[in-house]
Amino acid sequence: MNGLIIGMDLCDSCTHISCQGQETIWSVPTRIGKEPDSDVWRVAEESAGGALEGMVVEDKLLSLAMKDGTATIDGVRYEGLYLLKMFLKQVLAIPRQASGKEEIENLVITVPKLEVKLVDCLMYCADFLEID
């Protein structure tokens, strides 16, 4: 086993991430910000103040993806599923940076209520992130 084993508790308000071999549990608001006039997406760790100052921010990403909703950010309309993908990409970078490892061997995600639509959304996200 060379890759990371990550556990994630994914909710509309906050996401908690733990990684085997790390003592830290990261808590991140389930929201994503986009820097104006760029393609740079960011999440904010609560321990770092949780601020996404100067950015357009979208939250409740699970609900948005589940209802096939959209959000307009910086004049561009994004599907909720796309925003969830960008959020997960950014959040998974946190344990990758902390461990110095890129490969994710196992990812376990818990959600408040398991629904078929949500499982489909998360499977699309895993494909996008190239996680088997």
Residue positions per predicted region:
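Early-domain small/polar-rich strand-loop-helix modules and first-structured segments
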Residues: 1-72, 127, 132
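Residue-level recognition of the N-termini of beta-strands and the immediately preceding loop/turn
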Residues: 3, 103-107, 122
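Gly/Ser/Thr-rich loops at beta-strand to alpha-helix junctions
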Residues: 11-14, 111-118
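Catalytic cores of large soluble enzymes that bind and process phosphate-bearing ligands
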Residues: 53, 76-87, 114
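Short hinge/gating elements
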Residues: 67-79, 105-108
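Phosphate/ATP-binding catalytic cores across multiple sugar-kinase/actin-like superfamilies
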Residues: 83-99
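Short glycine-rich phosphate-binding loop at a beta-alpha junction
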Residues: 96, 100-113
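Short, low-complexity, polybasic intrinsically disordered segments
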Residues: 116-131
